[in-house]
Amino acid sequence: NTNHVVIKVTGGAKSAAVVKRKMEYDARDNPEEVHFNEAGEIISVEKATQIATDDFHLAKAFAKNDTDTEKMNYNMVFSMHSKTDEKALMGAVSDTLRESFAGKYNYFYSLHNDTKNNHVHVTVSKASLDSTGKNLHLDKTKLNKHTRITKLQSEINYCVMHNHFVKFSNSV
């Protein structure tokens, strides 16, 4: 169906250098407009990269395994078929991220409209914002195939279906 949002977990960073490259890629169309956390604060790619890199090192400090193979953040793409209204798509992504991560994990998101499908690149830091030291864990075994994005339902009446969205939980 062409009226569906696809949300894919596309990877994560295993090094601070990869965090920097990913943030630069996401902000390539507008390096002064990276959306940050629940307020949707607009920050520069430099500031986003610094926060994400600091989070990377914090997540690594709390990681169960002290290896260079564990990813310290998660990358996602929210995409819709065709040129969906950019404001509605950004609002839906913002609402979904706020519901899942607000006050718990830092996240960054940027709109890309350079393909036939508008899409939003997202980076979510694994490092907890509280003092528990629990890193975020995306449980891919518990796919949630029918999560609705409230903003899209109310503003542009799209039903959300996706094949790679996962249940968010804290790892111990």
Model-derived regions: residue spans:
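N-terminal nicking endonuclease/strand-transfer module with a His-rich metal-binding environment
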Residues: 1-172
